[in-house]
Amino acid sequence: MTAILERRESESLWGRFCNWITSTENRLYIGWFGVLMIPTLLTATSVFIIAFIAAPPVDIDGIREPVSGSLLYGNNIISGAIIPTSAAIGLHFYPIWEAASVDEWLYNGGPYELIVLHFLLGVACYMGREWELSFRLGMRPWIAVAYSAPVAAATAVFLIYPIGQGSFSDGMPLGISGTFNFMIVFQAEHNILMHPFHMLGVAGVFGGSLFSAMHGSLVTSSLIRETTENESANEGYRFGQEEETYNIVAAHGYFGRLIFQYASFNNSSSLHFFLTAWPVVGIWFTALGISTMAFNLNGFNFNQSVVDSQGRVINTWADIINRANLGMEVMHERNAHNFPLDLAVVEAPSTNG
């Protein structure tokens, strides 16, 4: 008997690389989206850390009045921020090689644009990587769909809003106080608190927090005990076990008696779909609201006060909001313009004399 042994052709380097990239056996899945995600997020993170510590002041308003945002220029963790790219640059693509020098690039806030564009590309690739891993494992794609909500929100404030307003200088600063400043100015200019999509977003975030806390507390309160009273209930479970770890019927019964019968779910799939959909849809609407207000389709305004038969103003909460908005608008960019737009367009009263 003759045995014929064929020599197996060695796999090419590219083939081994492809297999390694797409292998689900790796401790951390990389995937083709990860090939782009890793360098973009590393770049964004590295530049953010360096700029937050040591970036020189940035001429954000384009009026030769630089604003410092880094720790070495007098800020702390709360007040520090990556200052947005200068209004003098507008929406122009502004990589380092477009500036005459690195000093000019830093003065005009080049790091902000670099960080934001790499970050948005990176988180979009992270979302794609979630879908890719789900696909390879034979899972459904809803993890990536859920993650699309924060991706949409980040894209709205860092990219869509600057595009609508005509300059990256209107983007959200990358810092704690900078975020609050962005929110205050956004309210002043767009009355976001009176926009229905923002209201849906608030309901989504707060409602999602409430439902998450309710679900977690119900589950942990209705665990099926597999141990004695002298042992931890956690010892009775194995990671990935097929058996249920908690009694959904007991949880359903408790909650149904606490509120009313139909306020609780007796189907696990329906319950978890609801827990996912509520905050995701809310944040989608918030991102959509930011994206429409970017082009000045603003929240409801009540600029026409309620008056009585004699023409006297009857003060309402809307008047308080309008006054607050004007005050906030006056205070921001105070050196770039003397009056808020709402006051600047009003015809000045004539004077005799």
UniProtKB/Swiss-Prot annotation:
The record marks Y161 as: Tyrosine radical intermediate. Tyr-161 forms a radical intermediate that is referred to as redox-active TyrZ, YZ or Y-Z. A quinone binds at H215, S264, F265. The record marks H190 as: Stabilizes free radical intermediate. It catalyses: 2 a plastoquinone + 4 hnu + 2 H2O = 2 a plastoquinol + O2. Chlorophyll a ChlzD1 binds at H118. GO terms for biological process: photosynthetic electron transport in photosystem II; response to herbicide. Keywords: Acetylation, Calcium, Chlorophyll, Chloroplast, Chromophore, Electron transport, Herbicide resistance, Iron, Magnesium, Manganese, Membrane, Metal-binding, Oxidoreductase, Phosphoprotein, Photosynthesis, Photosystem II, Plastid, Thylakoid, Transmembrane, Transmembrane helix, Transport. Fe cation binds at H215, H272. Residues 345-353 form a propeptide. The D1/D2 heterodimer binds P680, chlorophylls that are the primary electron donor of PSII, and subsequent electron acceptors. It shares a non-heme iron and each subunit binds pheophytin, quinone, additional chlorophylls, carotenoids and lipids. D1 provides most of the ligands for the Mn4-Ca-O5 cluster of the oxygen-evolving complex (OEC). There is also a Cl(-1) ion associated with D1 and D2, which is required for oxygen evolution. The PSII complex binds additional chlorophylls, carotenoids and specific lipids. Its EC number is 1.10.3.9. Chlorophyll a PD1 binds at H198. Pheophytin a binds at Y126. Belongs to the reaction center PufL/M/PsbA/D family. PSII is composed of 1 copy each of membrane proteins PsbA, PsbB, PsbC, PsbD, PsbE, PsbF, PsbH, PsbI, PsbJ, PsbK, PsbL, PsbM, PsbT, PsbX, PsbY, PsbZ, Psb30/Ycf12, at least 3 peripheral proteins of the oxygen-evolving complex and a large number of cofactors. It forms dimeric complexes. This is Photosystem II protein D1. It comes from Aethionema cordifolium (Lebanon stonecress). The gene is psbA.
